[in-house]
């Protein structure tokens, strides 16, 4: 946390997220806006049960509103002031993560938690 109580976060995009973000067509400007939004309120997204802390947030395409939106899933490690951007997908490609995807992401989050604790 910065002096004056302002929250800070380092953002880490896993390679799969980076590919998905670009494939959806989001811009660097939209990524910066997402990062600013999550820095202000890192627990904004809905918590996805059984994933070890994954959250899902709606992200609107510029000029198309929330109806033409995507979902970004991330995990916030507040203690380490780090947010991992895990996955992104369009609303029309799927509504939610599958059970298998949630299980895989939980394993990834467990590995990330372990690696953070060792730093």
Could you say what each language-model-derived stretch is?
Residues 44-88, 93:
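Basic/aromatic recognition patch in beta-strand/loop cores that engages polyanionic ligands
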Residues 16, 25-46:
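Compact soluble domain cores
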Residues 22, 45, 117-118:
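Short helix-to-loop capping/linker segments positioned immediately adjacent to catalytic or ligand/cofactor-binding
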Residues 13, 34, 53-55:
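A generic structural signal for short beta-strands and their flanking turns/coil linkers
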Residues 76-119:
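Enriched for short, Lys/Arg-rich terminal
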Residues 1-30:
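Arg/Lys-rich, positively charged N-terminal/basic patches that mediate binding to nucleic acids
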Residues 5, 19, 40-41, 76, ...:
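Preference for short coil/turn "hinge" residues that link or interrupt alpha-helices
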